[in-house]
Swiss-Prot record:
Catalytic EC class: ligase
Name of this chain's protein: Serine--tRNA ligase
Lineage of the organism: Bacteria, Pseudomonadati, Pseudomonadota, Gammaproteobacteria, Legionellales
Biochemical pathway: Aminoacyl-tRNA biosynthesis; selenocysteinyl-tRNA(Sec) biosynthesis; L-seryl-tRNA(Sec) from L-serine and tRNA(Sec): step 1/1
Keyword ATP-binding included in the entry's annotation: yes
Function according to Swiss-Prot or TrEMBL: Catalyzes the attachment of serine to tRNA(Ser). Is also able to aminoacylate tRNA(Sec) with serine, to form the misacylated tRNA L-seryl-tRNA(Sec), which will be further converted into selenocysteinyl-tRNA(Sec).
Species whose genome carries this gene: Legionella pneumophila (strain Corby)
Comment block on domains: Consists of two distinct domains, a catalytic core and a N-terminal extension that is involved in tRNA binding.
Subunit text: Homodimer. The tRNA molecule binds across the dimer.
Keywords, alphabetical: Aminoacyl-tRNA synthetase, ATP-binding, Cytoplasm, Ligase, Nucleotide-binding, Protein biosynthesis
Superkingdom classification of source: Bacteria
Positions annotated to bind L-serine: T231, S232, E233, E285, S385
MF GO annotations: ATP binding; serine-tRNA ligase activity
Length: 426
């Protein structure tokens, strides 16, 4: 959510900034609603004051034994008019809130202006793209040939965009989770946190998934209004909702492993084969809560921490700055890490690292006390994948395959697999 004061005082500036995203904000209509709100608030307060004065006068007249019925009728008329004004004011406030909740974040000035992913800017590359002397296979071809990855069985159990993994591939998948957690906790200093995988609507509103992106979520039946979490960013970030933190508590740096559940409502026809885009997947998430002045340095650190995982696994990747037309609605600035997939002969997203600035904090009422001014200020929130586990498995399978369809284990993972150094075709 954007700053209400900014929206009220300079809606045209907001419209200009959001246009960089391709988002049309009707500043004129918003300003008209704001003028109506102010007029109704002044009118309502005036009627309230007048009714209070008349009510007091009734009490004084009654003590003098005067006839108060005409005065009481006037007060009743004022009361009815006041209730009508309050109803109108509530309706205008609801309209303003609907607009406010629909607005995306203002992009940071350093974000490249562009229309879509074609306008994203490559920042750096790491690692050498492997040169194979044989026709490479995709991860799903490799997994099925190994007899350890079964999409047909998953489709029978549930439906499309699911997978069943067995044997060493299932073990490798689990090892990746532990490896990522160990690096982030032991070397990067994150605190591990375990959170619910089911969240309520208030949490989703706080991090920005509701009301705009409900179609991307799996909603549970029943009267609780619960949803399966699409990313642990949601429950982890909401741990500071409606809190006033001390400056000494900041920055807060959490790492969390969780399954994620997404409907992929807007992804019909995309990545229909394999594990690239699934309804259920595992992710290790990094979340920062910082002071406003520290958040952009934090974004660079968070991104580098995610990069370390790829470097330890010796997987070629690149870092891309998303343009204004491609960043997520709540983000002010985002870096994507894209790993090399030989079967597609291209880089694919494996992590998205974002600074949300105060966008989520304003929705969540997540604040801290500034020791220099003693003022209560909004924190900044950041999040990023460190990494998406399934896509990391995919990248290992494809980059570490040999001509026989065997998968060689990266050195960094061998201690997690009891010394296994190859997953062989039988």
């Amino acid at each position: 959510m954007l700053d209400n004061q900014l929206l009220r005082e300079n809606p045209q500036y907001v419209a200009t900034q959001l246009l960089k995203r391709g988002f049309q904000f009707d500043a004129v209509t918003f300003s008209q609603l704001e003028e109506k709100r102010k007029a109704l608030q002044v009118s309502t307060q005036s009627l309230q004051n007048e009714r209070n004065l008349r009510s007091k006068a009734i009490g004084e007249a009654k003590s003098r034994g005067e006839n108060i019925e005409p005065m009481r009728e006037e007060v009743n008329k004022l009361g009815a008019k006041l209730e009508q004004q309050k109803t109108e004011l509530d309706e205008v406030l609801k309209q303003i809130e609907v607009i406010s909740l629909s607005l995306p974040n203002i992009p940071h000035e350093s974000v490249p202006v562009g229309k879509d992913e074609l306008d994203n800017q490559e920042i750096r590359k790491w690692g050498d793209v492997p040169a194979f002397s044989f026709p490479v296979k995709s991860h799903d071809e490799l997994g099925e040939a190994l007899g350890q990855m079964d999409f047909a069985l998953a489709a029978k159990i549930t439906g499309s965009r699911f997978v069943v993994m067995k044997g060493h591939l299932a073990r490798l998948h689990r090892a990746l989770i532990q490896f990522m957690l160990d690096i982030h906790i032991q070397q990067h200093g994150y605190q591990e946190i375990y959170v619910p995988y089911i969240v309520n609507a208030d949490s989703l509103l706080g991090t920005g998934q509701l009301p705009k992106f409900e179609a991307d979520l799996f909603k549970l039946t029943g009267d609780n209004g619960y949803y399966l979490t699409s990313t642990s960013e949601i429950p982890v970030t909401n741990t500071v909702r409606e809190m006033i933190l001390s400056a000494e508590q900041l920055p807060i740096r959490y790492v969390c492993h969780s399954p994620c559940f997404r409907s992929e409502a807007g992804s019909y026809g995309k990545d229909t084969k394999g594990m690239i885009r699934q309804h259920q997947f595992e992710k290790v998430e990094l979340v920062w809560i910082t002071k406003p002045e520290d958040s952009y340095n934090a974004l660079e650190q968070l991104t580098q921490h995610a990069e370390v995982i790829l470097q330890r696994l010796n997987l070629p990747y690149r870092v891309v700055a998303l343009c204004t037309g491609d960043i997520g609605a709540g983000s002010a600035k985002t870096y994507d890490l894209e790993v090399w997939l030989p079967s597609q002969n291209t880089y694919r997203e494996i992590s998205s690292c974002s600074n949300m600035e105060a966008f989520q904090a304003r929705r969540m009422k997540a604040r801290f006390r500034n020791p220099d001014t003693n003022e209560i200020q909004l924190v900044h929130t950041l999040n990023g994948s460190g990494l998406a586990v399934g896509r990391t498995l995919v990248a290992i399978m494809e980059n570490y395959q040999d001509e026989h369809g065997n998968i060689h284990i990266p050195d960094a993972l061998k201690p997690y697999l009891g010394g296994i150094d190859i997953i062989s075709v039988k």
